[in-house]
Amino acid sequence: VREERLKTTAGLRGTPALPLSAWRGHSGRRYVVGVHPAGGFDLDEMAEAVVIAVRRDDTGIAEMVSVATSNESPRDHLRRTWLDRVRRSGATELHVHRLAEGEAERAAIVSDLRFDTIEPAQV
């Protein structure tokens, strides 16, 4: 499992484009993600998405801290707890994948990206 950085161009009308990246899972599948700073992350961004908490080493290489999925029902306390935990673990970025068709596909993506951990798969 590894990150593959993507080059982005300016958005429409010259606005900055959302930083994009991709993660390659154990299966070889690639998952494109939007990159968000962990500090000001909005909990609503986690709804119906796969979220990868990331920290970078001194050379800029991404290290996955945790990966989880969240369904559409609001579970703000659990989401906030997960966010607090990954921030304390050094996560500075949250990579959000929104292209999964439903909860089963999001769970499969988490399994594909997951490393051996006791972290919950869903928050």
At which residue positions do the language-model features occur?
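Aromatic- and Lys/Arg-enriched surface recognition patch
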Residues: 75-96
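GIY-YIG nuclease catalytic motif and its immediate N-terminal context
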Residues: 1-82, 103-123
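Structured alpha-helical
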Residues: 100
